[in-house]
């Protein structure tokens, strides 16, 4: 590839990624030359500004046509734009939490947190725009390796070390399984380009090849299910959530999970949606019942085990497992509005989950003090924050008037509009949602109907207050006026360019 060819590419489509990369490199150099006793909070603010500028650059590309560069290894389509917006919004909110987290632990600011955070975000954004299995895998590893280190960033903390070890082991196994599945796809087609793979597989008719492709589908989907923390591949989540810091848990719960669904949609839908699997059904349609079974099991296991949890982080970990099941309902239904339903639900999930973790971060005065009883009497100590937490819990539970309700309703209706309708899956969704009321309202009871155990005044840093306010506004606004979000997607025409 000569210099003139490089100059001919439209590098502007990668501007959001270039900004994140540049800020991450700059932060690493600044941190290297800063005195050890200097406060690293400014690095966090610099990282936040970088994410904001990257988001603005993404908005400037919002109405641009589909563009691919570097041999179609990087493509900017409606799917990439919409999901990168989710990743940037979630990352910006988590970063505000992290800036005000470390002083509470009375440890020095560690600058590496911020550029590792940005590196993980960069990997997730690359996954959203990947048009090639190699680019997709590089993005996945950028996200995964950075996440492993972020979980273990408290090197002398026993629970953090245990969580990081479990995360590395399960994550490595998941990566190996995913790569094994992708190797079958490459071996069959001789290409790593997703578009070329889809074209070749669409013309496959030999029944002997169906077994190989079915194995590739199962291996790839099982490996990626670890990233989603869907049952039965969720066992790492509770321990990792309990051992990691609250900002890192927020990142894993929101940004990393969103990236997981991004790669599932990019690989599974792009490659297997048009691959024949006997009769007139595609391979994706053939495996839809298995995905539906996995979705139902994830909703049941996540919500029922959460009932037994006293540790709030472990409770929210199992809640996160259940929410992965809800999103998988949309994936199993394969309705024409699948992308919009998944995108809206993940947007609602960003606001209600990060908001809940923001309040937990302040209420939990000690890193290991995360029992549900820490919320006792919160309404008397901080009425506004108790009301805000109630809004987040209501949204997580799917109560009308909140963004969570609209997200669940869209997915629920999507399960009915397809042929054949997924009545059983929709019923499981309703029943498990009702079950979730028990453990969500357990926190509600602690806040409003239990006596105050701690009388000391809660300190609410400006960054945390900003996160809570933004999340409350987002949760309520999307619950009352959901068309605001859908109007945001109007230029994309139901993601019609996804398979082009």
UniProtKB/Swiss-Prot annotation:
An annotated GO cellular component of this protein is:
plasma membrane
Its subcellular locations are:
Cell membrane
Tell me its EC number(s), please: 7.1.1.-
Sorted UniProt keywords = Cell membrane, Membrane, NAD, Quinone, Translocase, Transmembrane, Transmembrane helix, Transport
What residue intervals traverse the membrane? 13-33, 42-62, 79-99, 111-131, 133-153, 168-188, 211-231, 245-265, 281-301, 321-341, 342-362, 386-406, 424-444, 461-481
What kind of membrane protein is this, topologically?
Multi-pass membrane protein
What reaction gets catalysed by this protein? a quinone + NADH + 5 H(+)(in) = a quinol + NAD(+) + 4 H(+)(out)
InterPro entries listed in its UniProt record: NADH-Q_OxRdtase_suN/2 (IPR010096), ND/Mrp_TM (IPR001750)
A single GO BP: ATP synthesis coupled electron transport
Which GO molecular function, any one, fits this protein according to its record?
quinone binding
Subunit note:
NDH-1 is composed of 14 different subunits. Subunits NuoA, H, J, K, L, M, N constitute the membrane sector of the complex.
Family according to the record: Belongs to the complex I subunit 2 family.
- Function recorded in the entry: NDH-1 shuttles electrons from NADH, via FMN and iron-sulfur (Fe-S) centers, to quinones in the respiratory chain. The immediate electron acceptor for the enzyme in this species is believed to be a menaquinone. Couples the redox reaction to proton translocation (for every two electrons transferred, four hydrogen ions are translocated across the cytoplasmic membrane), and thus conserves the redox energy in a proton gradient.
**Protein's UniProt name:** NADH-quinone oxidoreductase subunit N
Record organism? Anoxybacillus flavithermus (strain DSM 21510 / WK1)
């Amino acid at each position: 590839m000569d210099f003139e060819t490089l100059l001919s590419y439209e590098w502007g489509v990668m501007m959001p990624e270039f900004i994140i990369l540049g800020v991450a490199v700059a932060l690493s150099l600044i941190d290297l030359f800063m005195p050890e006793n200097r406060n690293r909070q400014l690095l966090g603010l610099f990282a936040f500004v970088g994410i904001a500028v990257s988001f603005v650059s993404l908005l400037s590309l919002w109405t641009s046509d589909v563009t691919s560069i570097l041999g179609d290894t990087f493509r900017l389509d409606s799917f990439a734009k919409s999901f990168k917006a989710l990743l940037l919004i979630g990352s910006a909110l988590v970063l505000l939490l992290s800036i005000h987290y470390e002083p509470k632990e009375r440890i020095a600011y560690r600058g590496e947190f911020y550029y590792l955070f940005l590196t993980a975000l960069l990997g997730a954004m690359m996954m959203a725009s990947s048009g090639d299995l190699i680019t997709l895998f590089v993005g996945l590893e950028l996200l995964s390796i950075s996440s492993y280190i972020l979980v273990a960033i408290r090197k002398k903390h026993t629970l953090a070390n245990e969580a990081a070890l479990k995360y590395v082991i399960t994550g490595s196994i998941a990566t190996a399984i995913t790569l094994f599945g992708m190797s079958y796809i490459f071996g069959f087609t001789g290409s790593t380009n997703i578009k070329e793979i889809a074209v070749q597989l669409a013309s496959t008719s030999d029944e002997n090849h169906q077994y190989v492709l079915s194995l590739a589908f199962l291996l790839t989907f099982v490996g990626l299910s670890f990233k989603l923390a869907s049952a039965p591949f969720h066992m790492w989540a509770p321990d990792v959530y309990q051992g990691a810091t609250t900002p890192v848990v927020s990142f894993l719960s929101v940004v990393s999970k969103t990236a997981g669904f991004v790669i599932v949609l990019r690989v599974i839908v792009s490659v297997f949606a048009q691959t024949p699997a006997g009769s007139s059904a595609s391979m994706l349609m053939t495996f839809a019942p298995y995905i539906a079974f996995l979705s139902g099991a994830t909703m049941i296991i996540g919500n029922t085990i959460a009932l037994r949890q006293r540790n709030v982080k472990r409770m929210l970990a199992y809640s996160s497992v259940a929410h992965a099941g809800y999103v998988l309902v949309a994936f199993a239904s394969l309705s024409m509005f699948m992308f919009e339903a998944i995108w809206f639900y993940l947007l609602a999930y960003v606001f209600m989950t990060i908001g809940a973790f923001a309040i937990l971060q302040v209420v939990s005065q000690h890193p290991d003090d995360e029992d549900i009883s820490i919320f006792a009497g919160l309404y008397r100590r901080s009425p506004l924050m108790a009301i805000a937490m109630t809004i987040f819990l209501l949204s997580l539970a799917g109560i009308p008037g909140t963004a969570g309700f609209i997200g669940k309703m869209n997915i629920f209706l999507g399960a009915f509009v397809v042929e054949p309708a997924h009545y059983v899956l929709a019923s499981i969704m309703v029943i498990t949602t009702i079950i979730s009321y028990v453990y969500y309202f357990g926190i509600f009871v602690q806040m409003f109907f239990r006596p105050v155990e701690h009388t000391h005044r809660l300190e609410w840093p400006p960054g945390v207050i900003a996160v809570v306010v933004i999340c409350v506004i987002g949760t309520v606004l999307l619950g009352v006026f959901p068309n605001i979000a859908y109007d945001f997607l109007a230029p994309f025409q139901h993601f019609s360019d996804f398979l082009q």
